[in-house]
UniProtKB/Swiss-Prot annotation:
It comes from the Eukaryota. CDD domains: TCP1_delta (cd03338). Keywords: ATP-binding, Chaperone, Cytoplasm, Hydrolase, Magnesium, Metal-binding, Nucleotide-binding. It catalyses: ATP + H2O = ADP + phosphate + H(+). This is T-complex protein 1 subunit delta. It holds the Pfam family Cpn60_TCP1. Its EC number is 3.6.1.-. Residues 1-26 are annotated as: Disordered. ATP binds at G50, G102, T103, K171. ADP binds at G50, G102, T103, T104, S105, S170, K171, G422, Q507. It comes from Takifugu rubripes. The keyword Hydrolase applies. Residues 1-15 have a biased composition (Polar residues). It is found in: Cytoplasm.
């Protein structure tokens, strides 16, 4: 009997008379667990922030290795199990989509803000008050950032180059920034109209990776570049090209799976072969009749896209053939050369063809060949960037670096304003938000002050990664900014503090604003969670 009483009394702990659940510590424990997991993710990428940041080597289950210091790439490939840690991975992805750069900064800021939240919660401040105060702080922060930004014109090539170079400085391929930065700026400028553009469709800039050579061999091509080889090597150069793109096969038609053809003697066999020959010859004649002298053939999985007989006839008619065109490349090809995809031979007419000055197969010094189509008459503005490198790791990191540089220029097209780099905006925010907190009262002032202190993590981490003393560096920066020197930032090259605008370390305003707002939104979301429930 006493055992029964003990059991019933144990089951009633945590419940009051009305049967409502009362576990005072549980929400606090859940918050602490969420904050700890998210901070662990932020700490993992913190060392890769800035031009002197370290790189990460990531190995997947297949054994493939990636070397990078791009925050979005590191987090995307990281195995994260905790739900709130996954929120930081999503945060990095959101920053990558919105701005394309600042993917490490946004996670580091979020980690520092969560640390501040933890301290505020331990002092008994309610999560809702912290959340609302952080929203006030970020609204004020956006005002401060906008006030310290400088307008930029898209015609000012020098400023665009400085922004792209700053983005490339923290990458593995930073020593090639003098080549890759102008390439990125030129690529964006060729696919937009600077007077009217409000955004850039990066699908108009195709990055082609080709193994061999060095990054010095990267080039920008106004036109189309294909990694597929020319099928008939006797026709490898065509001037005044008329280009057709077919989505059907130049091979004998196959019977259905269920049907069979029984050939009883050799005359019937001969007739089948003659029919096949006539069928293919008619198709090739129709292609030639339309005036086509360069033919692209989409990859087919059902049967041979191009039979040997068809290739023989095309060769005789001096038509250059490139087969195995991938389905996802078709839209870009059509936009670049002004052709239309042809699904049936009956639709193969002159108006479906695209035109170009020159189509040729180019040899790459013993490391394969590329097909280049230049002088395209199409109104669709597109460019191709050929990325070369000695191995797969270098090529992939170069591609990511070029993508980040393109995104930086896209940010300047979207919001035409620049801001200093080198931790200057974050320290300016910390100083101005500390002043703003004095105008508030009660708990809000305390929370905004904690928010401003958290932003010091960026200059502190930059200094730490560059081998400087973070405490003395941040203290000196605070003094300079308090005296009104808004552009004082960490000069990683010289190892000290200087006017960062004079050093041409600049970044788009959109990157800073996006990082601040997205990090704050994520922190507020994590802060509001007081329970984790496993669904069935």
């Amino acid at each position: 009997m006493p055992e029964g009483k003990a059991t019933s009394s144990a089951s009633n702990t945590g419940k009051n008379k009305g049967g409502a659940y009362q576990d005072r510590d549980k929400p606090a424990q859940i918050r602490y667990s969420n904050i700890s997991a998210a901070k662990a993710v932020a700490d993992a990428v913190r060392t890769s922030l800035g031009p002197k940041g370290m790189d990460k080597m990531i190995q997947d289950e297949k054994g493939d290795v990636t070397i990078t210091n791009d925050g979005a790439t590191i987090l995307k490939q990281m195995q994260v199990l905790h739900p709130s840690a996954k929120m930081l991975v999503e945060l990095s992805k959101a920053q990558d989509i919105e701005a394309g750069d600042g993917t490490t900064s946004v996670v580091v800021i979020a980690g520092a803000l969560l640390d501040s939240c933890n301290r505020l919660l331990q002092r008994g401040i309610h999560p809702t008050i912290i959340s609302e105060s952080f929203q006030k702080a970020v609204d004020k922060g956006v005002e401060v950032l906008t006030a310290m930004s400088q307008p930029v014109q898209l015609g000012d090539r020098e400023t665009l180059l400085n922004s792209a170079t700053t983005s490339l400085c923290s990458k593995v391929v930073s020593q090639y920034s003098s080549l890759l930065a102008p390439m990125s700026v030129d690529a964006v400028m060729r696919v937009i109209d600077p007077a009217t553009a409000t955004s850039v469709d990066l699908h108009d800039i195709k990055i082609i990776k080709k193994l061999g050579g060095t990054i010095d061999d990267c080039e920008l091509v106004e036109g189309l570049v294909l990694t597929q080889r020319v099928a008939n090597s006797s026709v490898s150069r065509v001037e005044k090209a008329k280009i057709g793109l077919i989505q059907f096969c130049l091979s004998p038609p196959k019977t259905d799976m269920d049907n069979q053809i029984v050939v009883s003697d050799y005359t019937q066999m001969d007739r089948v072969l003659r029919e096949e020959r006539a069928y293919i010859l008619n198709m090739v004649k129709q292609i030639k009749k339309a005036g086509c002298n360069v033919l692209f053939i989409q990859k087919s999985i059902l049967r041979d896209a191009l039979s040997d007989l068809a290739l023989h006839f095309l060769n005789k008619m001096k038509i250059m053939v490139v087969k195995d065109i991938e389905r996802e490349d078709i839209e870009f090809i059509c936009k670049t050369i002004g052709t239309k995809p042809i699904a049936h031979i009956d639709h193969f007419t002159p108006e479906m063809l695209g035109t170009a000055e020159l189509a040729e197969e180019v040899s790459l010094d013993g490391s394969g060949k590329l097909v280049k189509i230049t002088g395209c008459a199409s109104p669709g503005k597109t460019v191709s960037i050929v990325v070369r490198g000695s191995n797969k790791l270098v090529i992939e990191e170069a591609e990511r670096s070029i993508h980040d540089a393109l995104c930086v220029i896209r940010c300047l097209v979207k919001k035409r304003a620049l801001i200093a780099g080198g931790g200057a905006p974050e320290i300016e925010l910390a100083v101005r938000l500390a002043e703003y907190s004095r105008t508030l009262g009660g708990m809000e002032a305390y929370c905004v002050r904690a928010y401003s202190d958290a932003l010091e993590v960026i200059p502190s981490t930059l200094a730490e990664n560059a081998g400087l003393n973070p405490i003395s560096t941040v203290t000196e920066l605070r003094n300079r900014h308090a005296q009104g020197d808004k552009m004082a930032g960490i000069n990683v090259r010289k190892g000290g503090i200087s006017n960062i605008m004079e050093e041409l370390v600049v970044q788009p305003l959109l990157v800073s604003i996006s990082a601040l707002t997205l990090a704050t939104e994520t922190v507020r979301s994590i802060l509001k969670i007081d329970d984790v429930v496993n669904a069935r």
